[in-house]
């Protein structure tokens, strides 16, 4: 950390620690901000040693400035930190970050006006060429030397190392495209080819990329046909598709086309072709469709949003279609818990409001809250049911009857009539109704227990099933007579009157 923190020492460090992060804020710049900035520069394949001088900070600011429009919040913070550091090296006193940015912008405007005035003092074509060169003198990798000439600065090994590491780790995932766009900002076709040739693996993907470049080069030749006739001395020829791809053009020709008046940005055109090919390769390496991205039942909404937008970056569609996918599929493919919350927010909710509302959904606290709400609803419903049963029953109200006087509308304990003596059931004295042994009745109003030995709610006389008579053939009649005799004999018990009187002539 000592090497990183040695960017500022002495009085410069004291002035650095007096600068506020925000206008009117309490927090100020500290040593840790310098350490963080050096680490971020290494991550962006830049040399942290340039932070030790004013010229180095100027180079870093020129390299980071083109990516500010599409850069992240971390990139803007890095640019602001370098702007304050540039003011410290330039002995410009500033109070906060906003003042430092204003000083940097003012200085940049003065330098640009000086460059334009110097270029306007030159004569003829040299004046036009110098003014065109001054307009892009800050663009990497073309820099202006002390003699005012545009020279090419080769791509650094740090940039190549960062590019190769991204390809090896990400394997053409959607984030490879913005990384290539950032590393190749302002590069010439020769620099872009150097970056592509540095990729050792994934040769199948590189072949697909080469086919896309050839198709775009053929389309360029069709839309930009060459003019017939000889080329004037000192005039550059018009670039063909193969010249833009860097296969049939030299480095000096590429610099000449880029710095011509009007310029032909062959590097930007070639980068656009490569990005088209990378989009095709990313779609090949990431076959997952945005329609298949669904939130799991226990997946946090933040992770689901990250997966959704990562897949959305790989989708080859217009911005209008992507906006429709975001507005529709992001809510439609969420889990039921988050979907209920998102629908309650309405269609005009922002992503920040969605993530804030769905924060913690699926976790232990959310489950406990849902369980508590469900139990509260059940308890409230139970209280309402009990109140309904006690207060206002669904059926007709039962009339009460007094056992003492026999009138309705009051109970016996509230009866004002004289107390009736004896049992209220049988009318006899000597016992109460609860001890009455009189005849009881069942729910049918009949005596209990039944005298017939069978409860009164059973059928007393059961009819036997009948069948058609059987045809008689003689021997069946004999069997019937025998059965009849057996039946008659079974009616009498073993000890009958016949055995008492012996041979009774009337019984024969």
Swiss-Prot record:
Capsid protein p24 is phosphorylated. The record marks 140-141, 371-372, 387-388, 442-443, 458-459 as: Cleavage. The keyword Transmembrane helix does not apply. Residues 104-113, 477-488 have a biased composition (Basic and acidic residues). GO terms for molecular function: RNA binding; structural molecule activity; zinc ion binding. One of its GO terms (biological process) is viral translational frameshifting. A motif (LYPX(n)L motif) lies at residues 491-500. Residues 492-508 have a biased composition (Polar residues). A lipid is attached at residue 2 (N-myristoyl glycine). A motif (Nuclear localization signal) lies at residues 26-32. A zinc finger (CCHC-type) spans 400-417, 421-438. Residues 104-133, 446-508 are annotated as: Disordered. Keywords: Capsid protein, Host cell membrane, Host cytoplasm, Host membrane, Host nucleus, Host-virus interaction, Lipoprotein, Membrane, Metal-binding, Myristate, Phosphoprotein, Repeat, RNA-binding, Viral budding, Viral budding via the host ESCRT complexes, Viral nucleoprotein, Viral release from host cell, Virion, Zinc, Zinc-finger. InterPro entries: Gag_p24_C, Gag_p6, Lentvrl_matrix_N, Matrix_HIV/RSV_N, Primate_lentivir_Gag_pol-like, Retrov_capsid_C, Retrov_capsid_N, Retrovr_matrix. It comes from the Viruses. One of its GO terms (cellular component) is host cell cytoplasm. A motif (PTAP/PSAP motif) lies at residues 465-468. A motif (Nuclear export signal) lies at residues 16-22. Late-budding domains (L domains) are short sequence motifs essential for viral particle budding. They recruit proteins of the host ESCRT machinery (Endosomal Sorting Complex Required for Transport) or ESCRT-associated proteins. p6-gag contains one L domain: a PTAP/PSAP motif, which interacts with the UEV domain of TSG101. Belongs to the primate lentivirus group gag polyprotein family. This is Gag polyprotein. It comes from Simian immunodeficiency virus (isolate CPZ GAB1).
């Amino acid at each position: 950390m000592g090497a990183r923190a040695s960017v500022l020492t002495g009085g410069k460090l004291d002035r650095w620690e007096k600068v506020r992060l925000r206008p009117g804020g309490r927090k100020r710049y500290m040593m840790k901000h310098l350490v963080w900035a050096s680490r971020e520069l290494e991550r962006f394949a830049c040399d942290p040693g340039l932070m030790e001088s004013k010229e180095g900070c100027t180079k870093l600011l020129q390299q980071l400035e083109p990516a500010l429009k599409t850069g992240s919040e971390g990139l803007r913070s890095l640019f602001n930190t370098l702007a304050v550091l540039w003011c410290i090296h330039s002995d410009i006193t500033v109070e906060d970050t906003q003042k430092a940015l204003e000083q940097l912008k003012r200085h940049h405007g003065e330098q640009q006006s000086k460059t334009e005035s110097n270029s306007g003092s030159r004569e003829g074509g040299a004046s036009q060429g110098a003014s065109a060169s001054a307009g892009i003198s800050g663009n990497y990798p073309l820099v202006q030397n002390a003699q005012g000439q545009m020279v090419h600065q080769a791509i650094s090994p740090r940039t190549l190392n960062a590019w190769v590491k991204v390809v090896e780790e990400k394997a053409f995932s959607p984030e490879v495209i913005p990384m290539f766009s950032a590393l190749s900002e302002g590069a010439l076709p020769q620099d872009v080819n150097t970056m592509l040739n540095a990729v050792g693996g994934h040769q199948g993907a590189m072949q697909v990329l080469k086919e896309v470049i050839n198709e775009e080069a053929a389309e360029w030749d069709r839309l930009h046909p060459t003019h017939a006739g000889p080329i004037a001395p000192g005039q550059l020829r018009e670039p063909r598709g193969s010249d833009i791809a860097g296969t049939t053009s030299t480095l000096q020709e590429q610099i000449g086309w880029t710095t011509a008046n009007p310029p032909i940005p062959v590097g930007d055109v070639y980068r656009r072709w490569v990005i088209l090919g990378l989009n095709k390769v990313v779609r090949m390496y990431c076959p997952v469709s945005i329609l298949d991205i669904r939130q799991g039942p226990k997946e946090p909404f933040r992770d689901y949003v990250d997966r959704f937008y990562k897949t959305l970056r790989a989708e080859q569609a217009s911005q209008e279609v992507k906006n429709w996918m975001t507005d529709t599929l992001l809510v439609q493919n969420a889990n039921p818990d988050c979907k209920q919350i998102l629908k309650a927010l309405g269609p005009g909710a922002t992503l920040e409001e969605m993530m804030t509302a769905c924060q913690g959904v699926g976790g232990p606290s959310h489950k406990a809250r849902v369980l508590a709400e469900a139990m509260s609803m059940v308890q409230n419903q139970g209280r309402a049911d009990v109140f309904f049963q006690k207060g206002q029953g669904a059926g007709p109200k039962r009339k009460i009857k007094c056992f003492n006087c026999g009138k309705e509308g009051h109970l016996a304990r509230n009866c004002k009539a004289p107390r009736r003596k004896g049992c209220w059931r049988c009318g006899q004295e000597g016992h109460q109704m609860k001890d009455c042994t009189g005849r009881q009745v069942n729910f049918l109003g009949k005596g209990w227990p039944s005298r017939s030995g069978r409860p009164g709610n059973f059928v007393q006389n059961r009819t036997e099933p009948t069948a058609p008579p059987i045809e008689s053939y003689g021997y069946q009649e004999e069997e019937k007579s025998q059965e009849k005799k057996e039946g008659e004999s079974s009616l009498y018990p073993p000890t009958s009157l016949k055995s008492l009187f012996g041979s009774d002539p009337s019984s024969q």
